[in-house]
Curated annotation (Swiss-Prot):
The gene is GGT3P. Its main location: membrane. This is Putative glutathione hydrolase 3 proenzyme. Its EC number is 3.4.19.13, 2.3.2.2. InterPro entries: GGT_CS, GGT_lsub_C, GGT_peptidase, GGT_ssub, Ntn_hydrolases_N.
Length: 568
């Protein structure tokens, strides 16, 4: 009898252990794996519901471009502080069938009545109707869809129309900016009507509905891009901007065209090619950073010991400083001859000359890097990366310029408009002693210099290896470079490449900003080499990346903005 009881007791213990084990295992087995590797297609962006919209568009037979447009329309709702249909974007597109890359430029342009000295202060270029440029976002979607779309145009709008009507919880990124811009928003009746409850800005998790934008999306879905530029929306858009003191006219909207660039900027990295936009974007800056650094033959060993890691990061920061010194010469190639500048910035010989000027034991005064002009900060961006089942890819970055752009929001259409603060102005001085860049002065029809660099890396076999880009003002270029360096040279998986603590230096001001959780060995090594370091108040930009691995497409959406990838 005693023996029987012992056996029964042991069986009971085993049964309990099995049940506990199943309880622990089953929930995790039903979840998506933490590494986010997808066998067929992937999307990385900074809003979960938008990722799911992009993924479902791919599942429904949509192309990479279809998924990008559908997801961007959603991001324009959920992260309205960063982008929307009243702004502009660039798309880098790779077609796996033709094995060709192209860029679509749909950045906003200065109105025909604009002139170089139209702003006497930064406030004028940042806020109000006068600061609004001619939006290009919808024309960009149209051109991309005409060239690469598979699903009907209207289908791409439907998920976001539903989302705008039903509402959604305010996410981490939008909530942080609403709190940061609380005073401005609560004092603007139209903005506060959208983003406030009981005259107080919405907090994370509270519900935001956008019924006016839903109506506008419906009109665009039915009428196409024409509705915005010379159709049923056009007159109201002009009226809203001019009522706020702006100079955008019907003629400006009628004449706006997105631009196809069939031969984008590219450089070699080992046995791969990196495709990105040239000037007026910061592709040449990214190219110069990587060309300088590839001469060091970085590898996993470059960051193995504190000494090696410190030297490696010093070299990276010095490459940033040289590249940003040359950035000040860039501008819109339709108005400024930047051929020689871009040729130098993408030349391995030129990069080697700059590399030879990097001292491993110290940094140098600003004048050592020979900056010629100063260009203003930019900000308020959103990026997404997409890879479709056929191996085609899109890297897209859209921007409203500064958070909430011009702060001009239509009480009728719900459209929030950009500002022109990315231009330089002869009337606005800076504290760094460098004159404003004439290459970036305002002219009618001109586009300003920007830090965006949506990038696609392709191997010799014609297959995409990496799709990457970032959002976050002038930090975009350095963060995109770091993600590539971390993955390609240091051997970090894509999740670590996106999440790894980062640093930034744009030469002016003479400060290296580091994220709070960066390795202390890096900070100590920089300070030993006379770098002025400061801890970032929040985070340094937000990266979205997809990388080809043996197991499929590994995707990472930056947790700094609450991102999470999707795929299948």
């Amino acid at each position: 009898m005693k023996k029987k009881l012992v056996v029964l007791g042991l069986l009971a213990v085993v049964l309990v252990l099995v049940i506990v084990g199943l309880c622990l295992w089953l929930p995790s087995a039903s979840k998506e794996p933490d590494n986010h590797v997808y066998t067929r297609a992937a999307v990385a962006a900074d809003a979960k519901q938008c990722l799911e919209i992009g993924r479902d568009t791919l599942r429904d037979g949509g192309s990479a471009v279809d998924a990008a447009i559908a997801a961007l329309l959603c991001v324009g709702l959920m992260n309205a502080h960063s982008m929307g249909i009243g702004v502009g974007l660039f798309l880098t597109i790779y077609n796996s069938t033709t094995r060709k890359a192209e860029v679509i430029n749909a950045r906003e342009v200065a109105p025909r009545l604009a002139f170089a000295s139209m702003f006497n202060s930064s406030e004028q270029s940042q806020k109000g109707g006068l600061s609004v440029a001619v939006p290009g976002e919808i024309r960009g979607y149209e051109l991309a869809h005409q060239r690469h779309g598979r699903l009907p145009w209207a289908r791409l709008f439907q998920p976001s129309i539903q989302l705008a009507r039903q509402g959604f919880p305010v996410g981490k990124g939008l909530a942080a900016v609403l709190e940061n811009k609380r005073t401005v928003i609560e004092q603007q009746p139209v903005l506060c009507e959208v983003f406030c409850r009981d005259r107080k800005v919405l907090r994370e998790g509270e519900r935001l509905t956008l019924p006016r934008l839903a109506d506008t999306y419906e009109m665009l879905a039915i009428e196409g891009a024409q509705a915005f530029y010379n159709g049923s929306l056009m007159a109201q858009i002009v009226k809203d901007i001019q009522a706020a003191g702006g100079i955008v006219t019907a003629e400006d909207l009628n004449n706006y065209c997105a631009e196809l660039i069939e031969h984008p900027l590219n450089i070699s990295l080992g046995d791969a090619v990196l495709y990105m936009p040239s000037a007026r974007l910061s592709g040449p800056v990214l190219a110069l950073i990587l060309n300088i650094l590839k001469g060091y033959n970085f590898s996993r060993e470059s960051v193995e010991t504190p000494e090696q890691k410190g030297l490696t990061y010093h070299r990276i920061v010095e490459a940033f400083r040289f590249a940003y010194a040359k950035r000040t010469l860039l501008g819109d190639p339709k108005f400024v001859d930047v051929t020689e500048v871009v040729r130098n910035m993408t030349s391995e010989f030129f990069a080697a000359q700059l590399r030879s000027q990097i001292s491993d034991h110290t940094t140098h005064p600003i004048s050592y890097y020979k900056p010629e002009f100063y260009t203003p900060d930019d900000g308020g961006t959103a990026h997404l990366s997409v890879v479709a089942e056929d191996g085609s890819a899109v890297s897209a970055t859209s921007t409203i310029n500064l958070y909430f752009g011009s702060k001009v929001c239509s009480p009728v259409s719900g459209i929030l408009f950009n500002n022109m603060d990315d231009f330089s102005s002869p009337s606005i001085t800076n504290e760094f002693g460098a004159p404003p860049s004439p290459a970036n002065f305002i002219q009618p029809g001109k586009q300003p210099l920007l830090s965006m660099c949506p990038t696609i890396m392709v191997g010799q076999d014609g297959q995409v290896r990496m799709v990457v880009g970032a959002a976050g003002g002038t930090q975009i270029t350095t963060d995109t470079a770091l993600a590539i360096i971390y993955n390609l040279w240091f051997g970090y998986d894509v999740k670590r490449a996106v999440e790894e603590p980062r640093l930034h230096n744009k030469l002016l001001p003479n400060v290296t900003t580091v994220e709070r959780n960066i390795d202390q060995a890096v900070t100590a090594a920089l300070e030993t080499r006379h770098h002025h370091t400061q801890i970032a108040s929040t985070f340094i930009a937000v990266v979205q990346a997809i990388v080809r691995t043996a197991g499929g497409w590994a995707a990472a959406s930056d947790s700094r903005k609450g991102g999470e990838p999707a795929g299948y």
